Amino acid sequence: MSAAAEPAAGTGGDRPAAMRFIMVAVLIDFLAVGLIIPVLPALVGQFTANPAEQTRWYGWVAFTYAAASFVAAPMLGALSDRYGRRPVLLLGFCGLALNFFATALATSLWMLLASRVVGGAMQANAAVANAYVADITPPEQRARRFGLLGAMFGIGFILGPVMGGLLGGIDLRLPFFVAGALALLNLLYGVFVLPESLPAERRRNVTWSAANPLSSLRALARLKGVGLLMPVLACVGLAQFTLYTVWVLYTTFKFGWGPTQNGWSLFAVGTVAALVQGVLLGRILKLVTPQRLAVLALCSAMVANIGYGLATEGWMIYAIILMNLLGNTVGAALQSLVSGAASGSEQGQT
């Protein structure tokens, strides 16, 4: 790794306080996202009584969300490389709040689709959060720090879906209002507490190529050692997005679960993820390299995903969640490998 990738003295380096700030911000962010997962398919179902149409429209809702995130992620990353991480993160928190309130007030499927486009674009600031962590962390500690960030994701999934399931039992739209309030809280937290991580001397100008998703992929592919990881990253992203997109529909139709039961199942997913990434990951990395951990994690996740598809009873889902401990480290391991190949001014694009 080049010297440019090292955190700048006096502005970067190991900054535990800044790490705590971004961890809280990410926790609130994913708590808000987790709130809506158990109830979003049912909200789509309010606009159509046909189960086949509900599934199709939910697929479009998920697709537009993911497409917006794909397009927006490099744009937000490039903007954060130019103007700093903090303003881009604040923009994302504001956009998420508007998205949640718009979804809660949607009166048609088209309004729901439009609000999810905004949500997908703003949720892309998760990439900026990763860049923030890279800015404030020495290279040798990044895998562990990315694991802590993943633990915040897990805790958000511990609390969010359970709260969403319980609130959804009162009213399907209530979780969206609560999620919007949390996003506003995150915005206020960021305005008054969150420090900037990228000093002015390490920023660079924004170019159209940097904001182009395909150009960003090509730039990543040119980084030493990352080109071979690109197919792996694509497959992992596709698998994870597909799993969480169909989770509620799958368990509802196969096991007859409602919002509360789905909330508890996602609670289990988040608990295991937080335990592994927040407590066990540092110990695991003392035994194996990030490269070897990535291979082990991918194998574990592959077996688990096949198991979900073959499960015939609801309790089997919980057993598979418990067995897939290593699978929860795949994101931190791969992100560490990619981040280690990028210079300090390119972290927003990783």
Predicted feature locations:
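Juxtamembrane intracellular "pre-TM" segments in multi-pass secondary transporters
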Residues: 3-16, 195-231
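Conserved MFS/SLC helix-loop-helix module at the cytosolic interface between two early adjacent transmembrane helices
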Residues: 70-109
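C-terminal transmembrane helical hairpin of 12-TM major facilitator-type secondary transporters
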Residues: 291-334
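Helix-to-loop junctions at the C-terminal end of transmembrane segments
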Residues: 72-84, 276-290
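Short amphipathic helix-loop junctions that connect adjacent transmembrane helices
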Residues: 39-55, 245-261
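Cytoplasmic helix-loop-helix junction between adjacent transmembrane helices
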Residues: 114-154
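Helix-loop-helix hairpin linking two adjacent transmembrane segments in secondary transporters
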Residues: 152-192
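Residue-level signature of mid-helix packing/kink "hotspots" within the transmembrane helices
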Residues: 66-74, 124, 157-158, 270-278, ...
